[in-house]
Design a protein with these regions (language model features):
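N-terminal auxiliary segments of SAM/dcSAM-dependent transferases
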Residues: 1-56, 64-67
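A short acidic, Gly/Pro-enriched loop at the edge of an enzyme's catalytic core
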Residues: 88-91, 152-167
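Conserved class I S-adenosyl-L-methionine
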Residues: 89-99, 117
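Conserved SAM-binding loop of SAM-dependent methyltransferases across substrates and taxa
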Residues: 100-112
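Helix-to-beta-strand junctions that scaffold the AdoMet/dcAdoMet cofactor pocket
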Residues: 111, 176-177, 193-195
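A short glycine-rich, Lys/Arg-flanked "PGG" loop and its adjoining helix->strand segment in the class I
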Residues: 182-195
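Conserved beta-strand signature within the Rossmann-like core of class I S-adenosyl-L-methionine
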Residues: 196-203
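Core SAM-dependent methyltransferase catalytic element
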Residues: 218, 222, 229-254
Length: 254
């Protein structure tokens, strides 16, 4: 895994209840269940004790998986996804819903002669999102000279047709509330990609529909796969899946 020095926060919204308070709550519930299992065991209630211990361990394990995914796992996974794109280094890349820049800046490191542009509405799906936070991370990662951020809606992108060589998105499109809005976000990604351009979307749900639609549009090399335990947000029931595809046509680079 390539190192990163920026502050990328914790995936999720913590405006009502802080991440610290939620962590304390989870720890409290887990400890209470484990303590109760001990008392049940001492009183001969073996089945109840086992169920309580399993519940306490499950709560703790789920929290640990979530923390790992948001602080470590997604960086490992996206390093591999970006490596698989085999970027030349001179592409123009767009990140839909870039947040604090975890994927945007990892991509920018691979674009010494290119440009990485991130768009976001800077809402609550990742606490502390702001253009200034992303640009501060770009400076910390030494890629500020090739990074740009815009406040923009991914369903109505402020870019001309065929503006980008690569479009990526991580855990963002699912935040659009309506199916029609999510379809429109994919339509915009399709529109702004150049012929021969590559698309990589990682998300918690809706990815199979994206893949089916891209196949119907005649896109090449459409792949849909589970990204594995490193991006389990609490467990396999909240797993992340990836869609990759290539737009029909030949890029200007050949």
């Amino acid at each position: 895994m390539r190192g990163h020095t920026g502050d990328y926060g914790i995936d999720g919204s913590f405006h009502i209840v802080s991440a610290r308070a939620q962590l304390v709550g989870v720890a409290g519930v887990s400890a209470a269940l484990l303590l109760w299992s001990v008392t049940r065991w001492a009183r001969g209630r073996r089945l109840t004790a086992a169920l309580a211990a399993a519940g306490g361990g499950g709560v703790a394990g789920s929290a640990a998986l979530y923390g790992y995914a948001t602080r470590v796992g997604k960086f490992v996974v996206w390093d591999r996804v970006l490596d698989d794109l085999r970027l030349r280094g001179d592409e123009t890349l767009l990140d839909l819903g870039c947040g604090r820049g975890a994927v945007l800046l990892a991509a920018a490191k691979r674009l010494p002669r290119g440009r990485a542009i991130g768009v976001d509405l800077w809402r609550a799906d990742q606490t502390g999102n702001s253009p200034s936070a992303t640009l501060a991370n770009a400076a910390l990662e030494n890629v500020a000279d090739r990074v740009e951020v815009r406040t923009a809606d991914m369903t109505a992108l402020p870019f001309a047709d065929a503006s980008f060589d690569v479009v990526v998105s991580s855990l963002a499109i699912h935040n659009i509330r309506t199916p029609g809005g999510r379809r429109q976000a994919l339509s915009e990604a399709v529109r702004v990609l150049r012929p021969g351009g590559r698309l990589a979307i990682a998300d918690l749900w809706g990815t199979r529909e994206h893949a089916d639609r891209l196949r119907a549009l005649g896109w090449r090399n459409v792949r849909h796969r589970n990204l594995g335990w490193r991006m389990w947000y609490g467990g396999p029931w909240v797993s992340t899946r990836l869609v990759t595809a290539t737009k029909p046509g030949v890029s200007a680079a050949g």
